[in-house]
Every structure is written in structure tokens, then in C-alpha cells.
């Protein structure tokens, strides 16, 4: 709300970006969160992100996210001026679990909804709370939240790949649904 709404991604101030490949996580951040660094979690400066994303795409990598095409990629492209994001968008080198489910079923299912009902797991913070927590100095909490979201998306995607089904509560129909997925 402070930046004038979702249509103004160029005005966003990106504080943290995380990636997770199923084994190793990267937290791109310019604040001290070194205590989050583990054998499978790397802490890197935000300035390194564009190089890692470019290398990943050059190696044929695809990005995975929930609502990645409508939110994450435009924010990275417009607010951080990461030019290689255009490659991902133009080449459709991403898997957007939200867009796939929404297109197939005509209803949007949040990451929280799908993860609760499919995996029995939930997000550790609502996305709307992250800027408030960040401004109050909760850099570690926001970094953990971002990394956990990446892990949840990966686990949901993997479950869908292995079982061809994810589960969610349909707000439109007020019932639990098994959603067949092909991703």
C-alpha cells in the first residue's frame, strides 16, 4: 500500500530474494543474517543475484514459484533492473504453480491453502506482514520467511510431480478439492 499498489513493481524496494533447489538455499540480502548460513544455505549480497540468475538461465535452468509470472519476475525485472529476467519471461523459462492451477480450475488457490491441504505445512508469515517486520528490524525473520516460501513451493511442486494431485480448499465452492496437476 505504501508504494501505490501491485501495479507499481518498479517502485518496490527489494530487501530479500531466496532460491531453493531441493537441497541448497540461497538468501540474497544486504543485512547481517549470517546465523542463517548452514551447510545447505548460502548468504549472498543482493548484487550477486543477477549474475546467478543469468548463469542459471545460460545453463538451461527454469525458475519455480507460486505467482512468479505475475509478481516475482516483474518485481525483479522492474525494481532491481535485472535484465536477464526478460529472458525467463520471453522464453517462459519458469514454472508458475499458481498460474497452472488457476488456469486449470478457474480459481486462485494461495500457496498457504495448497500447502496446508496437500503437505500439512503452512507459511511462517503472511506476505503482507513482511514489509512491516522488515521495517521493525526483523531481517532474519523476513529472510527465513522467504526461504521457507521457496521450500514450500518446491515441496508442493515435487508432490504434484510425484502424485499428479495437490489439494486445496475451494473458496468459490466451499469444499475441499483434489486438483490434478501436470507440471
Residue ranges and their predicted role:
Residues 1-14, 18, 91:
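Entry/capping segment at the start of metal-dependent catalytic domains
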Residues 16, 75, 99, 152-153:
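Hydrophobic side chains within alpha-helical segments
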Residues 23-108:
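Conserved DEDDh/DEDDy metal-dependent 3′-5′ exonuclease domain
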Residues 113-114, 118-177:
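Acidic, Mg2+-coordinating catalytic module of metal-dependent nucleases/exonucleases
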Residues 178-183:
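Short, amphipathic C-terminal "tail helix"
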Amino acid at each position: 500500500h505504501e508504494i501505490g499498489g501491485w501495479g507499481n513493481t518498479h517502485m518496490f524496494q527489494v530487501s530479500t530474494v531466496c532460491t531453493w533447489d531441493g537441497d541448497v538455499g540461497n538468501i540474497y540480502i544486504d543485512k547481517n543474517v549470517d546465523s542463517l548460513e548452514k551447510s545447505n544455505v548460502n548468504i549472498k549480497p543482493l548484487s550477486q543475484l543477477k549474475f546467478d540468475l543469468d548463469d542459471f538461465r545460460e545453463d538451461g535452468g527454469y525458475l519455480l514459484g507460486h505467482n512468479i509470472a505475475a509478481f516475482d519476475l516483474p518485481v525483479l525485472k522492474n525494481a532491481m533492473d535485472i535484465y536477464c529476467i526478460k529472458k525467463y519471461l520471453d522464453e517462459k523459462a519458469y514454472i508458475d504453480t499458481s498460474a497452472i492451477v488457476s488456469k486449470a480450475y478457474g480459481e486462485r488457490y494461495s500457496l498457504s491453502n495448497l500447502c496446508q491441504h496437500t503437505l500439512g505445512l503452512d507459511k511462517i508469515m503472511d506476505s503482507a506482514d513482511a514489509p512491516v517486520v522488515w521495517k521493525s528490524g526483523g531481517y532474519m525473520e523476513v529472510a527465513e520467511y522467504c526461504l521457507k516460501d521457496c521450500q514450500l513451493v518446491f515441496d508442493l511442486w515435487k508432490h504434484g510431480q510425484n502424485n499428479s494431485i495437490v489439494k486445496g480448499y475451494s473458496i468459490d465452492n466451499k469444499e475441499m478439492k483434489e486438483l490434478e496437476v501436470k507440471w
